[in-house]
């Protein structure tokens, strides 16, 4: 960093090299595009590259303006694996959306969240492509299995889970839980080890 000069000896470098990780875990939700005025001096930046983000006109966005870019995940997987030659683990990936609780033809409450199914399907297809590219991937987990308060916006209406929780931003709701359509879809993806994905 600017103004700091740390002397690192060869012995220090050896100790650091011996302390390498066994794998790299990371979260992936979106890609970002920045304009040409991005700050080169990080010490003058207030929000990293986000302060210069621009919309990518070639891809869709979520209700919260997050780019939906499955191919970006494949790119990131290949880039990280090529750079570090360590197994990778996707610890978070998912779509925050406004879900509508409905009653189906059998009288069961549910959410027809085809948008979430499409998002996850398309990202998992790209994960499979990255594995075919030679990326060593240890695992994949979605964010999250049940609706909860969004860490990025502090909202309950931004829902990620396979299970709907009847709770609203204003605190109303019964806290009852209902399986969304994506619940059984993802259960099938797991049972078939990805064989049920649509390419």
Regions found by a protein language model. Give the residues of each.
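Non-catalytic scaffold segments within catalytic domains of secreted glycoside hydrolases
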Residues: 1-199
């Amino acid at each position: 960093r600017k103004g700091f000069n740390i002397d690192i000896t060869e012995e220090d470098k050896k100790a650091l090299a011996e302390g390498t990780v066994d794998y790299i875990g990371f979260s992936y939700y979106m890609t970002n595009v920045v304009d040409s005025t991005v700050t080169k001096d990080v010490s003058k930046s207030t929000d990293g590259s986000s302060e210069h983000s621009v919309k990518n006109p070639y891809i869709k966005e979520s209700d919260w303006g997050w780019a939906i870019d499955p191919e970006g995940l494949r790119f990131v997987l290949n880039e990280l694996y090529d750079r570090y030659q360590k197994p990778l683990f996707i610890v978070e990936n998912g779509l925050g959306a406004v879900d509508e609780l409905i009653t189906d033809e059998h009288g069961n409450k549910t959410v027809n969240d085809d948008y979430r199914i499409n998002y996850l399907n398309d990202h998992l297809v790209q994960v499979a492509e990255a594995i075919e590219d030679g990326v060593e991937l240890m695992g994949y987990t979605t964010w999250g299995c049940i609706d909860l308060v969004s860490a990025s916006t502090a909202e309950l209406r931004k829902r990620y889970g396979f299970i709907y929780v009847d709770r609203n931003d204003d605190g109303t709701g019964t806290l009852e839980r209902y399986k969304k359509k994506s619940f059984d879809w993802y259960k099938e993806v797991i049972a078939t080890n990805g064989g049920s994905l649509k390419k």
